[in-house]
């Protein structure tokens, strides 16, 4: 029962983080940031769909749910706050650039996490095909 409660909590947190990403979307004007945010939302929704139906996959993305996605949200919230403050000194411009360079890397990392959810299935199917072909003498 405890595992089920933990799984439900993880899924709830994932859904909350995705919702927070969507809220950030409405407050960003930079097209490059918006594009990366949109891709991050889409891949996060795909991860959610996969782990919602397979608790074994959910275990593979705990760090993503507990740390990576919340960190991206915090970075975006601060980016929005600083952009709204209209501070454009040298340090802030460097920070904006760093954040803008970070977002595509975060997306690529999330994409790898999503892809890794299918690794064992790919190996299983490949093994089944090899065994069947061997048994058929092919």
Q: Which residue stretches match the model-derived regions?
A:
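Membrane-proximal, non-transmembrane interface segments of integral membrane proteins
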Residues: 1-52
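Soluble C-terminal extramembrane regulatory/interaction domains of multi-pass membrane proteins
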Residues: 35-138
């Amino acid at each position: 029962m405890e595992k089920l409660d933990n799984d439900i909590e993880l899924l709830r947190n994932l859904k909350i983080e995705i919702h927070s990403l969507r809220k950030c979307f409405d407050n960003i004007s930079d097209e490059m940031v918006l594009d990366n945010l949109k891709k991050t939302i889409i891949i996060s929704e795909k991860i959610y769909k996969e782990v919602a139906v397979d608790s074994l996959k959910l275990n593979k993305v705990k760090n993503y749910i507990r740390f990576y996605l919340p960190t991206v949200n915090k970075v975006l919230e601060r980016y929005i706050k600083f952009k709204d403050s209209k501070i454009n000194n040298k340090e802030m411009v460097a920070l904006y650039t760093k954040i803008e360079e970070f977002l595509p890397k975060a997306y690529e990392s999330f994409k790898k996490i999503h892809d890794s959810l299918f690794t064992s299935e790919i190996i299983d199917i490949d093994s089944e095909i090899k065994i069947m072909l061997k048994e058929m003498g092919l």
